[in-house]
From Swiss-Prot:
Impact reported for residue 491 to V: In strain: HFL4.1S
Organism for this UniProt entry: Drosophila simulans (Fruit fly)
UniProt protein name: G-protein coupled receptor Mth
Glycan-linked positions: 45, 109, 123, 170, 198, 449
Family membership: Belongs to the G-protein coupled receptor 2 family. Mth subfamily.
Ranges facing Extracellular side: 25-218, 270-278, 342-370, 446-454
Name of the gene encoding the protein in the UniProt record: mth
């Protein structure tokens, strides 16, 4: 019995020792405060002499793994590490101390000429708040064998006001422009070549991981918006009374908006990366088509109140929807064709739309070429819509006055009120859509200013919410819900295909306008 007890105790002790050896090699020491000291001199008492620093045995351990920045473990050859950063301040390098960084890649040993150009000093902020200028190799321990923080990195040039930073004695790093504090697993330093006029210099520069904004909020809003777009289209297809010319144009607009936002969502999730350029072209086509259909709606509203009794106008009225389709889809194809042609022919990057470049399956919106191919047409169409809505408002006021001089005033007044409601709802649509896209243009113009970029983030969320806003405006209003209930009960299935025109010579009463 005693033998069995001793055996169990021995087993427990062995397991504890194995676990401690594997998972707690150096007690109370962060892996990112250690360096590989396998090549250092080992003393009889188990201590190591590393770069003139005595590392006691209690601060050493044998590792057969390395910890990656995401806290996962990667199997490596067994080696000895020392918690030297507890004994002397460390500086976290991306590569060996005599290598130079070039486009995020570590290059081999620097030449003698490069070594003479190197500025080896760093400004280190001490615990008492004072700043000390220290030689990176003679006064600090260089940690160069830690895993790279990430694949994509950018460097900071502290000669620029927006690239200022503070390096602390304990290894933490403070980035000034967004006031973010980084640990040693999130940044690294390395020698980098800088242009100084006609000459070059080599200095130690911090490299940070590319800032990838969280897409959770955008994803939730865009998915909700897309669902609302589908519901809006479904209601307009289901309720026959909504399928007059206004309704048909509105359905086309919603389909274009849905497809454009779907490709934006694919780009956000990087689903379209395998067919990036075609996805960017299709997304551009549908967004431009959405703007053109919005201009069709504003033009049709103006034409509705303008009215005409000419034979040519009546002939056009019978084929108006076909004409609108030809204009909207045709102009979208023309704009897309010009963009694709420029993308393949224009060599100057300042004039090339650069579809599918810089990691985004869309037109490159960080350059001024976007104003020519994307925001320019957008500004023109917004200006056109504003003009049409102003002219329509003036016509409504004029018709309202003229009605007083004709017989059947009550019928004409009802017709005018119905069309006014249609105008009001589409005016709201344009104000919201036009405002959101106008803010988007403002965001594009001020993108180099971080403060204004944060302000215009509101515009982004407003843009992503367009489907939700349209659903509330057009579906959740009382008259549409009433028509939906009637359609579900099988009532009011007739569609009035007559044109919704206000003409002083020939006015027809139409109950089926969207109201």
């Amino acid at each position: 019995m005693k033998t069995l007890f001793v055996l169990r105790i021995s087993t427990v002790i062995l397991v504890v020792l194995v676990i401690q050896k594997s998972y707690a090699d150096i007690l109370e020491c962060d892996y990112f405060d250690t360096v590989d000291i396998s090549a250092a001199q080992k003393l009889q008492n188990g201590s190591y002499l590393f770069e003139g620093l005595l590392v006691p045995a209690i601060l050493t351990g044998e590792y057969d793994f390395r910890i990656l920045p995401d806290d996962s473990k990667q199997k490596v050859a067994s080696h000895i590490r020392g918690c030297v950063c507890k004994l002397k301040p460390c500086v976290r390098f991306c590569c060996p101390h005599d290598h130079i960084m070039d486009n995020g890649v570590c290059n081999d040993n620097m030449s003698e000429e490069e070594l003479t150009e190197l500025d080896p000093f760093l400004n280190v902020t001490l615990d008492d708040g004072s700043v000390s200028r220290r030689h990176f190799k003679n006064e600090l321990i260089v940690q160069w064998d830690l895993p790279m923080p990430c694949d994509g990195m950018f460097y900071l040039d502290n000669r620029e006001e927006q690239d200022q930073y503070t390096l602390f004695e304990n290894g933490t790093f403070f980035r000034h422009f967004d006031r973010v504090t980084l640990s040693k697993r999130e940044y690294c330093l390395q020698h980098l070549t800088f242009a100084d006029g006609n000459a070059t210099s080599i200095r130690i520069a911090p490299h940070n991981c590319l800032i990838v904004p969280s897409i959770t909020g955008q994803t939730v809003v865009m998915i909700t918006s897309l669902i609302c777009m589908v519901l809006t289209i479904a209601v307009y297809l289901f309720v026959k009374k909504l399928q007059n010319l206004h309704g048909k144009c509105f359905i086309c607009y919603m389909v274009c908006l849905f497809m454009g936002y779907l490709f934006l969502l694919f780009d956000l999730w990087q689903i379209s990366i395998s067919f990036c350029k075609p996805a960017g072209v299709l997304g551009y086509f549908f967004v431009m088509a959405a703007f053109l259909w919005l201009s069709v709606i504003s033009l049709h509203l103006w034409n509705t109140f303008r009215g005409s009794s000419h034979k040519a106008s009546r002939f056009f009225s019978e084929h108006r929807f076909l004409a609108y389709n030809t204009y909207a889809w045709g102009m979208s194809m023309v704009l897309t064709g010009i963009t694709v042609l420029a993308d393949n022919v224009v060599e100057d990057q300042d004039w090339n739309p650069r579809v599918g470049e810089e990691g985004h399956c869309w037109i490159y919106t960080q350059a001024w070429s976007a104003m020519l191919y994307f925001y320019g047409p957008m500004v023109f169409l917004i200006a056109f819509n504003i003009t049409m809505f102003i002219l329509t408002a003036r016509r409504i006021i004029g018709v309202k006055k003229d009605i007083q001089n004709f017989a059947h005033r009550q019928e004409r007044k009802q017709k005018l009120n119905s069309d006014k409601q249609t105008y009001t709802f589409f005016l709201r649509l344009f104000i919201i859509m036009g405002l959101s896209w106008s803010l988007e243009i403002g965001s594009y113009i001020s993108q180099s200013n971080q403060t204004w970029a944060n302000v215009f983030l509101v515009a982004d969320y407003l843009n992503w919410s367009q489907g939700i806003i349209i659903f509330i405006l057009f579906i959740l209003k009382r008259s549409t819900l009433r028509l939906l209930q009637e359609s579900i009960r099988g009532e009011g299935e007739e569609v009035d295909n007559s044109e919704e025109e206000i003409s002083l010579e020939n006015t027809r009463f139409d109950r089926n306008v969207l109201s």
